């Protein structure tokens, strides 16, 4: 599981029709029209909504002034390296021990925009599902397969 924060990410996840999400909503934010829209669409996708008090939300959130909505998203299944080599078609971006999470997220975002088939990360690279990578990918982490911890 990994965390995604904010209304835009919630909308991106819903637009991709990803189901079975746990959505934490800060108390008092549910009245917001945008959050109501997330509730309506999320119910159709079997999302579980939990209201969370502000102190707990601050503890969970990685941002100083969050929007009061956090998603717990299941990491997609990714083939292991031998399977990957047999089925590797298209254009891929290879990151060899890129450790800066902001750079990894930006490269994932660029790879998605360029129409790449996936991103490969070798051992020693930043965790693609860390808070900073997910945030800097701006939702692109959901748009293409990410193969990580590869020993090439």
Predicted regions and their residues:
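RNA substrate-binding interface of SAM-dependent RNA methyltransferases
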Residues: 8, 15, 30, 44, ...
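N-terminal positively charged helical leader segments and presequences
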Residues: 1-66
């Amino acid at each position: 599981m990994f965390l995604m924060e904010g209304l835009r990410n919630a909308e991106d996840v819903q637009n991709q029709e990803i189901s079975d999400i746990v959505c934490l909503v800060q108390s008092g934010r549910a009245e917001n029209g945008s959050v109501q829209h997330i509730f309506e669409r999320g119910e159709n996708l079997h999302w579980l909504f939990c209201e969370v008090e502000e102190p707990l939300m601050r503890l969970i959130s990685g941002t100083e002034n969050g929007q009061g909505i956090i998603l717990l998203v299941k990491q997609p299944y990714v083939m292991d390296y031998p399977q990957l080599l047999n089925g590797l078609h298209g254009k891929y971006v290879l990151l060899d021990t890129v450790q800066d999470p902001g750079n990894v997220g930006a490269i994932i975002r660029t790879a998605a925009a360029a129409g790449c088939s996936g991103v490969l990360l070798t051992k020693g690279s930043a965790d693609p599902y860390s808070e900073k990578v997910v945030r800097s990918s701006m939702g692109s982490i959901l748009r293409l397969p990410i193969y990580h911890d590869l020993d090439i």
